[in-house]
């Protein structure tokens, strides 16, 4: 059913039908495939696809739906390969939507929970970039500047190559 909902542009309905499978059948043999489908639905929304209400009425793209679905992926399968990339995508969407708190949270979880992930170096750079975006000038609070410098230094120390 989720595939049909996705093709019709009913992305949240697709996610909810996939969530039903996850909740009712946690030992489902194709559990990773379900998580992959949830990830695909979120990435379609992140790509800017037009959602349709009731399958025929075009509506506005709501990127917070993508964040919600990515959070569901992390919650449902925290040890899967999808979790680190979902957290990175949450931070990218949050930064685009000018929501640095959500970006900080996602990047912090990525850095702390998945330090061996291939996305950990990018998470350090992204965290520094988000802090750098908060710098408003020399007359204002210097904490974002210091934090950006700290994350750039951490990146250089932890990932010298």
What is the role of each PLM region?
Residues 1-161:
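Acidic, polar-rich low-complexity tracts and alpha-helical solenoid repeat scaffolds
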């Amino acid at each position: 059913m989720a595939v049909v909902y996705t093709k019709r542009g009913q992305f949240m309905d697709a996610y909810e039908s996939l969530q039903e499978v996850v909740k009712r059948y946690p030992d489902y043999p194709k559990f990773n495939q379900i998580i992959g489908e949830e990830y695909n639905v979120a990435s379609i929304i992140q790509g800017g696809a037009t959602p349709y209400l009731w399958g025929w009425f075009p509506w506005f793209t709501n990127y917070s739906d993508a964040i919600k679905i990515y959070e569901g992926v992390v919650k449902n399968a925290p040890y899967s390969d999808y979790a680190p990339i979902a957290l990175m995508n949450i931070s990218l969407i949050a930064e685009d939507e000018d929501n640095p708190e959500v970006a900080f949270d996602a990047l912090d979880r990525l850095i702390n929970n998945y330090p061996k992930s291939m996305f950990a170096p990018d998470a350090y750079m992204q965290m520094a970039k988000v802090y750098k975006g908060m710098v408003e000038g020399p007359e204002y609070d210097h904490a974002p500047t210091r934090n950006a410098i700290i994350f750039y230094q951490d990146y250089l120390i932890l990932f010298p190559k």
